[in-house]
Swiss-Prot record:
Similarity remark: Belongs to the SELO family.
Reactions catalysed according to its record: L-seryl-[protein] + ATP = 3-O-(5'-adenylyl)-L-seryl-[protein] + diphosphate; L-threonyl-[protein] + ATP = 3-O-(5'-adenylyl)-L-threonyl-[protein] + diphosphate; L-tyrosyl-[protein] + ATP = O-(5'-adenylyl)-L-tyrosyl-[protein] + diphosphate; L-histidyl-[protein] + UTP = N(tele)-(5'-uridylyl)-L-histidyl-[protein] + diphosphate
Binding site for ATP: 84, 86-87, 107, 119-120, 170, 177, 256
Keyword flag Lipid biosynthesis: no
Superkingdom of origin organism: Bacteria
Organism listed in the record: Escherichia coli O9:H4 (strain HS)
Protein name as catalogued: Protein nucleotidyltransferase YdiU
Pfam families for the chain: SelO
Gene: ydiU
Keyword Nucleotide-binding tagged: yes
Length: 478
């Protein structure tokens, strides 16, 4: 089958990119590809059998027109000016059978005009982390970019130490970022901001294109998508780590996996990025940061959208987030109805977990085994203060009984929203260390496991992290 590519970005937004081709690595070789995703995108299996090829930037497919995008942004709350694709190249936009498109973005593809002081490369460590994280999030049901392939090489790339150079093929319906809009707003080119908005509406919100109120309705939906995404992050214990405005997806996708982390111990102020000295991007601050970022996006639209309309959309953020978060947390607790004491029960559980540094994922998974008429629970052994747990658990079981639902029905619901497996940093690190020694077995094994996060397991993927894995420090270097 021949793949079809279109050039919408190149043709419609000529001042937002520089056209250039990838720079291949030395002795590049394909070490992993996403068979399921490739099948979904109708990619011929033969493309994965002829060396690095397009996956390593050594060849382009017919119709591809590679380019690096320019954007700007606020980093850690400070205006950083022009940024852009410093090591990534958008190879093309694949036209799918249903008329939608999928960006093929090659990360680690070499120097671009936006590389600044960087070398345009990515290392094997970071490409493995992003591939694992994006696929883990996808199978958790959270909107995200996807990973299609990883190529490693003999080219050394220097970070804290010399590491193998690598490339990741990332795919997404769009790589539109808040930072694209900021770039032209701060250059006082508001007409180009409007062109970006028109491009987004034309291709991703086409049902609004002929509405005279299209910009307000479109921005309201961007706010809603962002609020929904952040709510989902919070419910699974995901910390992004670097929520700069240039890392915010207009479509509400999880974008740019760097120093991310899933909670091990329940620690509301968890900071996964060791460069985040002030805790701006801590786990519990993510909802506030996302709103701040939306306010920066709204500012770029203010030359052609009424400020009252923008503020009205921003004002809806908290309620949308709380609604999504509340619905999912009630499901995680097994509540079939909404009762006034639900928030208090949840907050008391969180307080107990924080005091005891309970494992976030294991706690909710084990809670899924609760029988409403039995005081026995395997979760009890996870707590030192048994009396405090017993008190909470008795009131929790009383709440379950109000719903008049069988244990089996409720347990089935809870196990469908409380994963047994999340991508803990130590699991990724183990796969990385093996891959750096040339053994890809654990990389493939972990990828396969992450496809079924809600299935029961009895292996070390669902055990508590070892001592060495609890406080792994992760940086932005990639």
């Amino acid at each position: 089958m021949t793949l079809s590519f279109v050039t919408r970005w190149r043709d419609e937004l000529p001042e937002t990119y520089t056209a250039l081709s990838p720079t291949p690595l030395n002795n590049a070789r394909l070490i992993w590809h996403n068979t399921e995703l490739a099948n979904t995108l109708s990619i011929p299996s033969s493309l994965f059998k002829n060396g690095a090829g397009v996956w390593g930037g050594e060849a382009l497919l017919p119709g591809m027109s590679p380019l690096a995008q320019v954007y700007s942004g606020h980093q850690f709350g400070v205006w950083a000016g022009q940024l852009g694709d410093g090591r990534g190249i958008l190879l093309g936009e694949q036209l799918l059978a249903d008329g939608t498109t999928m960006d093929w973005h090659l990360k680690g593809a070499g120097l671009t005009p936006y590389s600044r002081m960087g070398d345009g490369r990515a290392v094997l460590r970071s490409t493995i982390r992003e591939s694992l994280a994006s696929e883990a999030m996808h199978y958790l049901g959270i909107p995200t970019t996807r990973a299609l392939s990883i190529v490693t090489s003999d080219s050394p790339v220097y970070r804290e130490t010399a590491e193998p150079g690598a490339m990741l093929m990332r795919v997404a319906p769009s790589h539109l970022r808040f930072g694209h809009f900021e770039h032209f707003y701060y250059r006082r080119e508001s007409e180009k901001v409007r062109q970006l908005a028109d491009f987004a509406i034309r291709h991703y919100w086409s049902h609004l294109e002929d509405d005279e109120d299209k910009y307000r309705l479109w921005f309201s939906d961007v706010v809603a998508r962002t609020a929904s995404l952040i709510a989902q992050w919070q419910t699974v214990g995901f910390a992004h780590g670097v929520m700069n405005t240039d890392n915010m997806s207009l479509l509400g996708l999880t974008l740019d996996y760097g120093p991310f982390g899933f909670l091990d111990d329940y620690e509301p102020g968890f900071i996964c990025n060791h460069s985040d000295h002030q805790g701006r991007y801590s786990f519990d601050n993510q909802p506030a940061v996302a709103l701040w970022n939306l306010q920066r996006l709204a500012q770029t639209l203010s030359p052609f959208v009424a400020v009252d309309a923008l503020n009205e959309a921003l004002d809806s953020y908290q309620q949308v987030l709380l609604t999504h978060y509340g619905e999912r947390m009630r499901q995680k607790l097994g509540f079939m109805t909404e009762q006034k004491e639900d928030n208090a029960l949840l907050n008391e559980l969180f307080s107990l977990m924080a005091r005891e540094r309970s494992d976030y994922t294991r706690t909710f998974r084990m809670l899924s085994l609760t029988e409403q008429h039995s005081a026995a629970s395997p979760l009890r052994d996870e707590f030192i203060d048994r009396a405090a747990f017993d008190d909470w658990f008795a009131r929790y079981r009383g709440r379950l009984q109000q719903d008049e639902v069988s244990d089996s029905e409720r347990q089935q619901l809870m196990q469908s929203v409380n994963p047994a497996l999340v991508l803990r940093n130590w699991l990724a690190q183990r796969a990385i260390e093996a891959a750096e020694k040339g053994d890809m077995t654990e990389l493939h094994r972990l990828h396969e496991a992450l496809r079924n996060p809600f299935s029961d397991r009895d292996d070390d993927y669902v055990s508590r992290p070892p001592d060495w894995g609890k406080r792994l420090e992760v940086s932005c270097s990639s």
